[in-house]
Design a protein with these regions (language model features):
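Conserved N-terminal catalytic core of the sugar/cofactor nucleotidyltransferase
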Residues: 1-19
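Conserved alpha/beta core of the MobA/IspD/sugar-nucleotide pyrophosphorylase nucleotidyltransferase superfamily
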Residues: 86-173, 179-183
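Short beta-strand-to-loop acidic/aromatic patch adjacent to the donor-nucleotide binding site
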Residues: 19-29
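Conserved core of the sugar-phosphate nucleotidyltransferase
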Residues: 31-115
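Conserved N-terminal alpha-helix of the aminotransferase class I/II PLP-enzyme fold
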Residues: 197-237
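N-terminal "arm"/small-domain region of PLP-dependent enzymes with the aminotransferase-like
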Residues: 163-214
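Short, acidic Gly/Pro/Ser/Thr-rich loop/turn segments
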Residues: 55, 79, 100-102, 146, ...
């Protein structure tokens, strides 16, 4: 039988109810300041979150204007159309003893019995956010460094972000892949600031499904179109 991290917490349910708890996943690398950030915040039940960026994967959340977490977004329910509203869970949580005892552990036990142990602990939090009285808030990061390492590529990126001696050389080795570092500004990259124009981008987006799904035009059609665009007479020889 396969198990997931919900089972790990289920095994620790008695200890969870004895005191306030910091829950940290083991595949993270992050600045020490994140500990101070979450511990010094007076709110008792917090999840560190980061505004969505293209490299992020896994569980997302939505926040209201008071930073209450109002929904957990799984991979199955993720929609690219809604990414402006998404925050990624950093997977560092602070839970009070009362929250664990009165809310999380009871739902954890019920969820595990109903759906089994091959689930994620965030699913329990998602159920709790559906209650009228939400006790869990998101605490957005403000530029602090962190990364989730799931494979060798993630490890290489994380080593680049946190490098102390040879960071420039590591970045330069990734030339052509700077888009994986959304906050990086490359002032040496030769680009045409006027291309592509906004209207062209909008036209490509509007026709993306056709461009992706249909066969490309053959040489005959492409030659005809190019001749038309450049006002050239097409030779019939």
């Amino acid at each position: 039988n396969k198990t997931n991290n919900i089972y790990s917490l289920y095994l620790a349910k008695e200890e969870l109810q004895k005191q306030d708890t910091l829950l940290i996943e083991s595949d993270l690398i992050f600045e020490d300041t994140l500990f101070h950030k979450i511990l010094n915040n007076p709110y008792p039940n917090l999840a560190l979150v980061a505004k969505y960026e293209p490299w992020m994967d896994g569980t997302m959340v939505r926040l209201n204007t008071e930073n209450d977490i109002i929904d957990f977004i799984s991979k199955k329910t993720f929609r690219y159309a809604d990414i402006d509203d998404y925050y990624k869970t950093v997977n560092i949580y602070k839970f009070s003893k009362e929250f664990l005892r009165n809310s999380y552990v009871p739902f954890l036990e019920a969820y595990s019995k109903a759906l089994g142990n091959n689930e994620y602990y965030e699913q329990v939090l998602r159920v709790i956010t559906l209650l009228e009285r939400c006790e869990l808030k998101g605490l957005p990061l403000e530029g602090e460094r962190w990364y989730e390492i799931d494979d060798i590529q993630d490890l290489d990126i994380a080593e680049t972000i946190f490098a102390e001696q040879d960071q420039l050389q590591r970045y330069q080795k990734r030339y052509g892949g700077y888009w994986r570092f959304p906050k990086l500004k490359d002032f040496c990259y030769l680009v045409n600031p006027y291309f592509p124009p906004q209207k062209m981008c909008e036209e490509l987006q509007a026709n993306f499904n056709v461009l992706l799904r249909e066969y490309p035009s053959g040489m005959g059609v492409n030659t005809l179109v190019m001749a038309k665009n450049f006002a050239q007479k097409l030779s019939t020889a």
